[in-house]
Amino acid sequence: MKKLTTLLLASTLLIAACGNDDSKKDDSKTSKKDDGVKAELKQATKAYDKYTDEQLNEFLKGTEKFVKAIENNDMAQAKALYPKVRMYYERSEPVAEAFGDLDPKIDARLADMKEEKKEKEWSGYHKIEKALYEDKKIDDVTKKDAQQLLKNAKELHAKADTLDITPKLMLQGSVDLLNEVATSKITGEEEIYSHTDLYDFKANVEGAQKIYDLFKPILEKKDKKLSDDIQMNFDKVNKLLDKYKDNNGGYESFEKVSKKDRKAFADAVNALGEPLSKMAVITE
């Protein structure tokens, strides 16, 4: 009986040991898989860091040209540069939270400043937009505002390498931005004087799509159907924007966009935002 008990105990220990080995193997596989995903997320974030650096570099170059046009009293050149230069900034807007107080200094609207009772502190591109498109003049105040804008653009450019960009910020920022496009920017509130809103929309969509493209390989391993759904909705939004391209590589005035198309665009962006918000699955 003692021998039988000993044999049974030995067998139990052997089975338990084998079970522990299998468990360790499974844990090892899971750990390696998690490490692989973390490495891919890190690589994608690094690539987006580089993308943001490039956009802010071009934004600074464009702002220098824009300010030079203001200094030369060249209204036509300043207006030609205005929407195109701003696109570099708008592409980076998913992570504008990382810009700190430089974001409102560069991109604040008068309505927002009034709401916060800070209209006397208003500065940036939209203040100059008002001078060019509504007041239709370049004076000493405009030139002073342009110099301050350039100073802020240089500061942001210098800060680019130290921005705290994370996968969470990228994902949440892209969803929040598209939600803003669909609910408030679609009214024309962003470029209220110049009506160059479609340039902003295109840049915002491109910025969000860049984030999707970088995370796409990871997402397709987790949820191929979700990835395909996001791509399909990006295609729909871009197709609607293409409808209002002009012959010079730019976009028509937002005033020319029909109410029907404004609604269609808002609906398309909302439809995109819904699956895009599920991309956080890649971090799980």
UniProtKB/Swiss-Prot annotation:
Keyword Transcription regulation: no
Lineage of the organism: Bacteria, Bacillati, Bacillota, Bacilli, Bacillales
InterPro entries cross-referenced by the UniProt entry: EfeM/EfeO_iron_uptake, Imelysin-like, Imelysin-like_EfeO/Algp7, Imelysin_sf, Iron_uptake_EfeM/EfeO
Name under which the protein is recorded: Efem/EfeO family lipoprotein
Keywords for this protein: Cell membrane, Lipoprotein, Membrane, Palmitate, Signal
PROSITE patterns: PROKAR_LIPOPROTEIN
Covalently attached lipid (S-diacylglycerol cysteine), positions: 18
Cystine crosslinks: none
Compartments (UniProt record): Cell membrane
